[in-house]
Amino acid sequence: MCGYYGNYYGGRGYGCCGYGGLGYGYGGLGCGLGSYYGCGYRRLGCGYGCGYGYGYGSRSLCGCGYGYGSGYGSGFGYYY
């Protein structure tokens, strides 16, 4: 749910932006534009090199803590 519904629809209230990948706006950085392309937990750098339709998050790319994917809905257990 997180990847597809969270990021494809912008991550607002759908489960992928900010605090623990639930809700939205915790810390605010990267939410909206960031979470639309990127992933959830880490609020810094999400959307800039993480996801962008590739389907997987990566801490090495953008520091997304739990590796929530992109609009494709991939990446629940991918903790890189």
Swiss-Prot record:
Tell me the keywords, alphabetical order: Keratin
Q: What does this protein do?
A: In the hair cortex, hair keratin intermediate filaments are embedded in an interfilamentous matrix, consisting of hair keratin-associated proteins (KRTAP), which are essential for the formation of a rigid and resistant hair shaft through their extensive disulfide bond cross-linking with abundant cysteine residues of hair keratins. The matrix proteins include the high-sulfur and high-glycine-tyrosine keratins.
This entry carries the following GO cellular component terms, namely: intermediate filament
Q: How does it assemble?
A: Interacts with hair keratins.
Protein name per its UniProtKB record: Keratin-associated protein 6-1
Family statement? Belongs to the KRTAP type 6 family.
Q: Which domain of life is it from?
A: Eukaryota
Show the taxonomic lineage: Eukaryota, Metazoa, Chordata, Craniata, Vertebrata
Which InterPro entries does the entry mention? KAP6
A single GO BP term for this record reads:
keratinization
